[in-house]
Design a protein with these regions (language model features):
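Short alpha-helical segment that forms part of, or immediately flanks, the ligand-binding pocket
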Residues: 4, 142, 160-168, 189
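Active-site-proximal region of nucleotide-activated glycan assembly enzymes
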Residues: 7-68
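Structural loop-to-beta junction motif characteristic of Rossmann-like glycosyltransferase folds
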Residues: 11-12, 149-150, 167-175, 196
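Alpha-helix C-terminal capping/helix-to-coil transition sites in glycosyltransferase folds
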Residues: 31-32, 143-147, 165
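Donor-nucleotide binding loops and adjacent catalytic segments primarily
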Residues: 68-70, 76-151, 185-188, 193, ...
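Acidic donor-binding loop of glycosyltransferase active sites
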Residues: 134, 146-161, 168-169
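A short, well-ordered alpha-helix in the C-terminal region of glycosyltransferases
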Residues: 222-234
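C-terminal alpha-helical cap of glycosyltransferases
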Residues: 233-251
């Protein structure tokens, strides 16, 4: 309704498509929109020529201000590299199971911070050295991201754009098509194609595929970082503000 009202009042409209394929709301709003902001190069070609701009997603400023020292209160007592597992706000049963089944082997080489989702704590692991688990965190996330050497995550658009902006080597495990419209799969494949991420399909997640992915990303982390550094999608807020100012000035 806001978009249609704005258009009827001759007010320019900018919409943002986070996922690689347009959702229903943006499809309906497209005829009324002056510009469409996109996260993925592939998305731009799905809109009329000249309508879409690859801007990326505005990133919360606090994520850039994380301090690894502040996250040391996780209780780690050695200098092992850190893996941060992020299963989304509600967690991921599939990822939680894979991590916990392999936790002893993981802890031989890494310290592990596991964000497992509400109600998903496993108290049998509470005293395991090098492993900390939380249902969910908010203000501490920036510091934990600063501490992490490698991130294992779902492939929601905002989450992966944050990993790109922070230059964090990552393994993406997108929601399966059976549990979603497939947008995370396409998001992940775009990042894989660009060289930003290693992708494991949810249905292919196993001990073997998990450790193969960890070995690849950790052993080649500098290559992943350098590839992400070539992306210009780190200052999306300024790009979008510039677009707004242009439309207002040319109204």
């Amino acid at each position: 309704p806001v978009v249609f009202a704005a258009k009827s009042c001759n007010i320019p409209v900018i919409i943002h498509e986070s996922d690689m394929t347009p959702g229903l709301a943006n499809k309906l709003e497209l005829p009324k929109a002056s510009r469409v902001c996109c996260n993925f190069p592939e998305t731009k070609d799905m809109f009329p020529e000249g309508k879409a701009v690859v801007t990326g997603t505005p990133i919360r400023k606090e994520l850039f201000n994380g301090n690894a020292v502040d996250a040391i209160n996780c209780g780690f007592t050695d200098n092992k590299p850190v893996i941060l597992i992020v299963g989304g706000s509600s967690g991921s049963a599939v990822i939680n199971k894979a991590i916990r089944e392999n936790i002893d082997k993981l802890l031989e080489r890494f310290n592990v911070i596991h964000l497992c989702g509400k109600g998903n704590l496993d108290h049998s692991l509470d005293n395991k050295s090098g492993y900390v688990q939380y249902e969910y965190i908010k203000k501490e996330l920036s510091s934990m991201l600063a501490l992490a050497d490698l991130v294992i995550s779902r492939a929601g658009a905002n989450a992966i754009c944050e990993l790109l902006a922070l230059r964090k080597p990552n393994i993406l495990i997108p929601l399966s098509a059976a549990a979603s419209r497939g947008d995370q799969i396409l998001n992940a494949e775009s990042f894989k194609k660009s060289g930003y991420s290693y992708v494991i399909k949810e249905e292919e997640l196993s001990s073997e595929t998990l450790f193969a992915a960890i070995d690849d990303v950790y052993n080649n982390k500098q290559t992943y970082i350098e590839t992400m550094e070539k992306s210009n999608l780190t200052d999306s807020t300024s790009i979008i503000i510039g677009m707004i100012e242009e439309l207002v000035n040319n109204k």
